[in-house]
């Protein structure tokens, strides 16, 4: 008989004392409550820098499963760059230094592309400010900003504030000028609407498009015409004599400071692909020997990468596999990539000895219409596997508290919590019957806050702590744990040595 060690992830199941708007607290959950009272338990931090996100930022399922599976803090691109700036490594970055050295030797210009906002989804304006300060420190004279306006990850009419903030840094450093302005609708298309990208290219390279004396004027004119940040037409900033402040020319350098690839790829390809055929670039195709991307955008972009991908070696799945143990990953469609691809550190392929079970999520318009989703089918499939003694390690995700929690509706979310509790009981009892151990936890909160203080639906994740229960009476747990400590704890329970790459610490004292 195998004694399975199971990790049960109750997706979106956070903890907070206030019961108002709290579906987790209001639901009847006798199984969870019993395990919480009977077995060693603590809470874990699942948001902010503890999971590699900026301080105070709510966690999410991708980040949560990455951290849990990796057994370490996995810094997301935004935080990675922030930490590099804070610790002084940003200015030493070899890729940035090469671009700066190039323009100084050639007497050419440095162009900064990117989304001008602090939304933190695709870019952060602080990273552009760090580049302006670096250029000033290194004595680069010609620095031009090609600002992509946001209006999507931030308010629809916030561009002026970001322009003001940029002008303050330009004044502080004595470096930088706005050269073009374009809404992200044009500059950051990802759906092959190349006519949009072409308008940007022609503004940046040929100085074609509406012209303005400064960035502020461009935004004000757009607003007057009912066009807000995201949709501002690619426009050119001109000097007193109506010539463009700057166009992009041979031997210039570009630093594209967006860190999220999907909406950066198309415009980067226009500048880096010699055989680009999506539209006619015209007679002027500037040769840019130093085109720097903040992160790895795509194999189709021929640029240098400032922050190269971090390979996650020796994740929990890999270590368990190398120890010769059999593992099962099981979830319904909505969370299947999380227990497989993300849990394995961004790896698609199965490890030796790994089996996967995918249960289809129900086909409904929104999950508040079916709060139980496919949890009963997932549970039946898993209990059958446990009874057949097939696996040493089980990774299970119950999706309901998160997927229904996103509705911001109390009644369906309470039902989702109650269905989750019912199935949690079935799975844990099957594991205990085999003399196994379950770890019950979550990747982030959601169902714990369904209403704002004024009664409006709250559809986002929360920053509340998540539960951590080990169904084994003879262990003691420490406080202050994070998601990256879960894999080392599982290895402790399995009696498998923790690899050096896993920098998390076991929660078992």
From Swiss-Prot:
Q: Which SUPFAM superfamilies match?
A: 2,3-Bisphosphoglycerate-independent phosphoglycerate mutase, substrate-binding domain, Alkaline phosphatase-like
Top EC class of this enzyme = isomerase
Gene Ontology MF, one: phosphoglycerate mutase activity
Pfam families noted in UniProt: iPGM_N, Metalloenzyme
Q: Which CDD domains match?
A: iPGM
State how it assembles. Monomer.
GO CC annotation terms, alphabetical? cytosol
Quote the catalytic activity from the record: (2R)-2-phosphoglycerate = (2R)-3-phosphoglycerate
HAMAP family the UniProt entry points to: GpmI
Q: Where does Mn(2+) 1 bind?
A: 402, 406, 461
Which residues are involved in binding Mn(2+) 2? 11, 61, 443-444
What is stated as this protein's family in its record? Belongs to the BPG-independent phosphoglycerate mutase family.
List of residues binding substrate: 122, 152-153, 184, 190, 260-263, 335
Named cofactor requirement(s): Mn(2+)
Put simply, this protein is called 2,3-bisphosphoglycerate-independent phosphoglycerate mutase
Q: Which residues form the active site?
A: 61
Could you tell me which Gene3D superfamilies the record lists for this protein? Alkaline Phosphatase, subunit A, BPG-independent phosphoglycerate mutase, domain B
Write out the function statement from the record. Answer: Essential for rapid growth and for sporulation. Catalyzes the interconversion of 2-phosphoglycerate and 3-phosphoglycerate.
Q: What EC number(s) are associated with this protein in UniProt?
A: 5.4.2.12
- Which lineage ranks, top first, belong to the organism behind this chain? Bacteria, Bacillati, Bacillota, Bacilli, Bacillales
Q: Which UniProt keywords apply?
A: Glycolysis, Isomerase, Manganese, Metal-binding, Phosphoprotein, Sporulation
Q: Which GO terms describe its biological process?
A: glucose catabolic process; glycolytic process; sporulation resulting in formation of a cellular spore
Native organism is Bacillus cytotoxicus (strain DSM 22905 / CIP 110041 / 391-98 / NVH 391-98)
Query: What's the record's note on cofactor binding?
Result: Binds 2 manganese ions per subunit.
Carrying Phosphotyrosine, the residues are 35
Q: Which InterPro entries match?
A: Alkaline_phosphatase_core_sf (IPR017850), BPG-indep_PGM_N (IPR011258), Metalloenzyme (IPR006124), PGAM_B_sf (IPR036646), Pgm_bpd_ind (IPR005995)
